[in-house]
């Protein structure tokens, strides 16, 4: 059977596991089908276009350890505000990805890895989802506090299981609360706990070193001071994520409101931007403000 250009594009994008591009190609393929005789092909394209379809059915052994999301269906770029500091981080990561691809051609392993640190609620995870959206890669999220196991050696095994996906599939690999396991080895707790933590940290670094150049690693922590120095050296970039100043909060709120075509009073705006609230706290209060406004309209 002679393939059309759209069908060739579909095969290319599916092989690269680019969900968004695969769906766009599938839509083009369905548009050029003159009859429904090829039942299997039509059914496969239709399933691909179904937003519930996931190209990343995880093995049972890592379900609950790792979550993988196609953010093209869930991320609202029009509501997301990128500060100038975060834009610099984003630009650096994108430039570095081009470098890693060139290094891969020379058979040189190099991981595009960034560690984001700072107080909670400053948008570390949301930045990871934004990066996945812009790069058209799946967002693989691993929260280290969820993989700690009381059984001896089990935490290290859980890490190895979770890393299998990122090693085999190019993605944005988000390592959240990385300080939960990779504690500096000079911070002593108990002899048995120290051995287990050391074993876990070594496993993490070994798995980290096996990641392909195509995978982009983002790690997040609130306690960079507790992370093992050998692991810190594996991150090519380290950035502090800080609470927005009042002007940045105002711009963030304004963009969100414009996206949903709503407004709030000047007093509400001042209440939202003043104080030391984090980005997450500000957005939570904004949504409550919007809900209150809509509630008043119902009365």
Where are these regions (language model features)?
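Conserved AAA+ ATPase small/helical "lid" subdomain
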Residues: 4, 14-15, 22-26, 30, ...
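Short regulatory helix/loop adjacent to the ATP-binding pocket of P-loop NTPases
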Residues: 223-236
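Walker A/P-loop
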Residues: 110-142, 160-168
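Interdomain "pre-motor" coupling segment immediately N-terminal to P-loop NTPase/helicase cores
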Residues: 18-76
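Structural recognition of the conserved hydrophobic beta-strand(s) that form the central parallel beta-sheet
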Residues: 174-175, 202-206, 215-221
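Conserved AAA+ ATPase "SRH/arginine-finger" region at the nucleotide-binding site
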Residues: 236-250
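Pre-Walker A (pre-P-loop) alpha-helix and adjacent loop at the N terminus of AAA/AAA+ ATPase modules
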Residues: 71-113
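Substrate-gripping "pore-loop 1 plus following alpha2 helix"
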Residues: 187-209
